[in-house]
Structure formats: C-alpha cells, structure tokens
Amino acid sequence: NGEVSAIFSNIDGIQDNKFSGPHPSGNVGVQIHHIDPIAKGDIVWTVSPYGVAQIGKLFSKGIYDASKLVAVAGSEVQEPQYYKTFIGASINKLVDGNLKQDHVRFISGNVLTGEKIDKDGYLGFYDNLLTVIPEGDQPEFLGWIKPQKERLSFHRAWGLFSFLNGKNKEYALDSNTNGEARAFVQTGTFEQVTPMDIYPTYLIKAIMAEDYDNMEALGIFEVIEEDLALCEFIDVSKHDIQHIVRDGLELLQNG
C-alpha cells in the first residue's frame, strides 16, 4: 500500500523494485530472477521486512524481539483474524473455539509450501500464517470421473465443468491429492505457472535423472521449492515437485 511504499522510498542506499501480479510474483526467487539472475557460484542473502526490524532492534536497543503477528485463515476457520504472539507459540489457543469442524488439516504456512502440524503443534520459525482446511480423506463416489463444477481443475479433468463458474469462483479445497504418483506426464502446463525464463518440466526431469550438467543449464541455481509449488499443485502425475527440487539442490551442494 501507499504507506509501506513511502517507508521504503525514504531509505537510503537501497534499490527499490516493485512487482505485481498473481502468485508466485511475490516469491523472492522469482523477483531475483528478473532483477539479477543467480549464476553458479553466486551467494544471495534475503531478509524479510520483519527480519530487518528484528535486526535493527537488536543492534539499536540490545533487545531480541521474539513477537510476531500471525494470520489464522482457511476455509475451516469461522473468523479469520490476526493474533499477536511469539515465535514458537502453540497453535492450540489460536484456533480453540474458532473452527467450523474438528476434522481438519493444520498447516504451518500456506497451502502450497507449508507443513502439516497437529493441533497441539507449533508454527514454524519463518511462518506468519496458520492455514486450516478440510482433511480430505473421505471417499467420493466416482472420484474425478464424476462431471461437476464445484471442483477446481487446471486441466478441466477433475471438475470437468468448473470453467462455468468463471475465474473469480472461490473453492474450499481439501488435502486430497485425488490420485497417487504415476508416470511423469508432460503436459506443457508447468511453464504456464512459472513466470521465469526456465523450462521447469525439463529441469525436474534432469533432477530425477541426476543429470548435473543439464540441471545447471536448465536453471537449478535460480529456484527453490516455493518457486515451483504451483507446478506440484497442478501436476497430473502427482509428484512431490518441491521435494525433487530440494533433492536437486542438495545433490549439487554435496556432489
């Protein structure tokens, strides 16, 4: 917003870059790619505005500020809201009495990159969001074969008539993957959700084949898990794309 922009515009010694658009335009990896792509041997440090404030308070006042503002949201939260709490706080009190049902999935972070936690679990160190969605372990008659429009489908296979709802339709998605891992099917859709000058399909296949040369040539140094999270979400082959990316990065680091 304007207030935030004014804060950053008044800081000396920085380069102010603005980005807009749908996810993943807010990912730092995508932004770095368009400002100054990472090459082999480069070291890039990133820090959030919240982290800057923590560091500033530590050095200016000698105080480590462990407080954080946490958003509790998701389709199964009755009243989504913000809570002021501390790093490592249990989520139990954040959701007590504020759920639409008990059979839910708690996620530390967002639905694309977050981690499953229990109701008596804790938010991750870097997470400022607790997401609550339906668990999604209930069997459904005919599954994805059943024509319907109440299911989101990027490929118009599951939820065949979902396009009739228009682009602004909101869906209450659950944790069901609607299938198991299968052969890698190339559909050309990964490139549609990756706003970077790379070929994610071929990069992922190079990682799976442990082909170091092609991994480097296809842009492994420019991505981390969150940058290809949408690829995992729309993958008809049901592969754990983010885990594959992490394996590739560790292969290069340890290789």
Over which residues does each language-model region extend?
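Buried, small/hydrophobic-residue-enriched core segments of structured protein domains
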Residues: 1-255
